[in-house]
Amino acid sequence: MNTIKILIGLLGIFLFSLSGIVSAQSDATTQLSQLLSNFRTYQAKFNQITFDGQDRVIQQSHGRVMIMRPGRFRWETDSPTKQIIITNGKTLWVYDVDLSQATQQPLAQKTNINPASLLSGSVKDLKQKFTITISPTSDAATFQLVPRLGKSLNFNWIRLKFSKKQLTEMTVLNNLDERSIFQFSQIKVNAPLSSTLFEFKPSRGIDVVKQ
């Protein structure tokens, strides 16, 4: 299972800058909802490492991510193979550069979740979709989100770690007991991004598969 594809509907929801260190006394869901309104765009480089259930490394990759609210997302993997995942909030493209093949499908079909409702960041929507807890420290905070929809989302939980007012790490445990850690660096929040980055137009010679 490709953990990156699990994150398609989630990264655009949860990548944002922490506006201030959060307190343990506040409700975690309310805090998360409030934080969602603090960003318009997010850019970062990432390093990913995935472990199996016996903590053996089974995958490593690196690349960059770009997000523009509402709903636009671009994830570029440079290694071990070059892959670009793009959505404008409606259509999802997965372009395997080395294979010259692109897969096109509705975003909601892939995620089994309505990204538009979650991108609103409302407490009601978050409480309906996830059980959320928070583990704060003096200079950081980690949110854990457990989906109420169970296996329909293909993951057991996702953790978002914030330090120095920015999201610096995300961990996902999928239904195969595979744990993927994404570390973010060179982060830019609310810097200008062109909307064309979130549109994909296959060039001549690319095989397009519609699902």
From Swiss-Prot:
The principal location of this protein is periplasm
Q: What does this chain do? A: Participates in the translocation of lipoproteins from the inner membrane to the outer membrane. Only forms a complex with a lipoprotein if the residue after the N-terminal Cys is not an aspartate (The Asp acts as a targeting signal to indicate that the lipoprotein should stay in the inner membrane).
Name any Gene Ontology BP term. lipoprotein transport
- Subunit organization: Monomer.
Localisation per UniProt entry: Periplasm
* Xref: HAMAP family: LolA
As given in the record, the signal peptide range reads 1-24
This protein's GO cellular component annotations are: outer membrane-bounded periplasmic space
Enumerate the UniProt keywords alphabetically. Chaperone, Periplasm, Protein transport, Signal, Transport
- This protein is called Outer-membrane lipoprotein carrier protein
Q: Which InterPro entries match?
A: LolA/LolB/LppX, OM_lipoprot_carrier_LolA-like, OM_lipoprot_carrier_LolA_Pbac
Q: Which CDD domains match?
A: LolA
